[in-house]
Amino acid sequence: LFKRRYQHDRLLQTIRNKQDKARDEYQRDCEQLETLLIPEECKERLKATRSRENYARYYGHKYNEPDLMPGWAAMEELTLGELSFLYSGLNRDADKKSIAKRLNLAAPLLESWLHCLTVIRNICAHHARLWNREPGIKPKLPKTVSFPWPSNLQQQEQHHRMFTVLSILNLLM
C-alpha cells in the first residue's frame, strides 16, 4: 500500500496518539462533570453527549477492539500535513490517480498542491507574513485545463505568489 520509505508506523502512532488524547480528555471531562451539583441523570446525559464530540473520542469510549478506529474515521482526525504525507506515501499510482480523479485532477498535480497548501497553512499557523511573499514552493500547474482556471496562470513562470494558491483553494472548494 505504501512506498518502502514511507513511515507508516508514524501514521499509526499519530492515530493512536489522537485516540489516547481523546480518551484522556473524555476522562477529564467526566471527572469535572462529577463535581457538578446537578442530578445524576443530567450528568449521564452530558457524559453521553461529550463521548460523541468526535469519532476518536466516541470510538475509544464505545469499542475495545480493534485498537485503531476505522480508516474513514482516522482520515477525519488527520491534519492537512498528515494527509499530504499519506497521499505522497501511497505506493501505487493507481491509488493516487483514483483519489485525484475524484477532484478532476492529475495525481502529480494533487500531490504538489497538497504539499503547497500544507506549507501555506504552516505559514499562517505560525503567524508569519503571507502577503506579497514567495512561499518557497511553487505548486505545479495543470498542463491541460479541464476545469475553470485563470488564464493568466497558463504560463509556467508566473505563479510564484499567492494568487496561484488562492486559485487552487477556490478550485478545491
Question: What spans do the regions from the language model cover?
Answer:
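Long, contiguous internal "core" modules enriched in hydrophobic/ aromatic residues
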Residues: L1-M173
